[in-house]
Curated annotation (Swiss-Prot):
InterPro entries: Mediator_Med10 (IPR019145)
Keywords for this protein: Activator, Nucleus, Transcription, Transcription regulation
Quaternary structure and partners: Component of the Mediator complex, which is composed of MED1, MED4, MED6, MED7, MED8, MED9, MED10, MED11, MED12, MED13, MED13L, MED14, MED15, MED16, MED17, MED18, MED19, MED20, MED21, MED22, MED23, MED24, MED25, MED26, MED27, MED29, MED30, MED31, CCNC, CDK8 and CDC2L6/CDK11. The MED12, MED13, CCNC and CDK8 subunits form a distinct module termed the CDK8 module. Mediator containing the CDK8 module is less active than Mediator lacking this module in supporting transcriptional activation.
Any Pfam family: Med10
GO biological process, one term: regulation of transcription by RNA polymerase II
UniProt xrefs under PANTHER family: MEDIATOR OF RNA POLYMERASE II TRANSCRIPTION SUBUNIT 10
Role according to the record: Component of the Mediator complex, a coactivator involved in the regulated transcription of nearly all RNA polymerase II-dependent genes. Mediator functions as a bridge to convey information from gene-specific regulatory proteins to the basal RNA polymerase II transcription machinery. Mediator is recruited to promoters by direct interactions with regulatory proteins and serves as a scaffold for the assembly of a functional preinitiation complex with RNA polymerase II and the general transcription factors.
Protein name as annotated: Mediator of RNA polymerase II transcription subunit 10
Gene Ontology terms, MF aspect: transcription coregulator activity
Amino acid sequence: MAEKFDHLEEHLEKFVENIRQLGIIVSDFQPSSQAGLNQKLNFIVTGLQDIDKCRQQLHDITVPLEVFEYIDQGRNPQLYTKECLERALAKNEQVKGKIDTMKKFKSLLIQGLSKVFPEDMAKYRSIRGEDHLPS
């Protein structure tokens, strides 16, 4: 899988370098540099074709739009992953707290019902396969 990304990264680096060189040629254009300009334009077209060929290998990869927003804002896209993990951890802790509360409530409810309806709760525990009161 990383091989696909390495291949794309290589093509993107070449493309960016050709764009940089094209910018240098264009910023100080002389009629004598027309051949070099044409060559760079051809390299850019070829580079775009190479990048497009990589697309077929990566068609199943999706990138959240928020990552592009981070990049547009000049932020590190890895911060997006970090913040997603932090949100997931916080949500996980919140859900764990709810689960623990529900387990405690169930235990207290069964204890209370066992005191008020001991025979019915004995039947309930036998149906559930529980031999004892939960603590």
